[in-house]
Amino acid sequence: DTSYAEKYLSKNLIQNWNSKLGWMEVNREKPVQERVRLLNAAPVFAFDKEGEEHDRVIYLIHGRMIGYYINIDTGEVVRGKTSPETFYEYWVYIREDGRWVLDEIRQKDEVDVEQL
């Protein structure tokens, strides 16, 4: 359920996450995230043009957490790890309706920051 964070998320990200959550429900899966720790957040890119529609800021997020998926019916872990792992992600913020909101999260090894 994304409702707890909707005021911080772009309309596009809410739609994408709700779609993914819907597929997880069909597959009888549920995400589990535990012991989430933010270790560092560093801005790596900013773009500001007249108007708001193209403004964006990208942060490199370094964190540590336990993240896995369980089968809703059995409680069995179906993917992921039940031990803590370090992660690096790019978090892309955009201006939408006059405020900054999270629009995209990409894994560091999936993308060249210049292409974001």
Regions found by a protein language model. Name each.
Residues 50-116:
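Exposed beta-sheet edge and beta->alpha loop/turn motif
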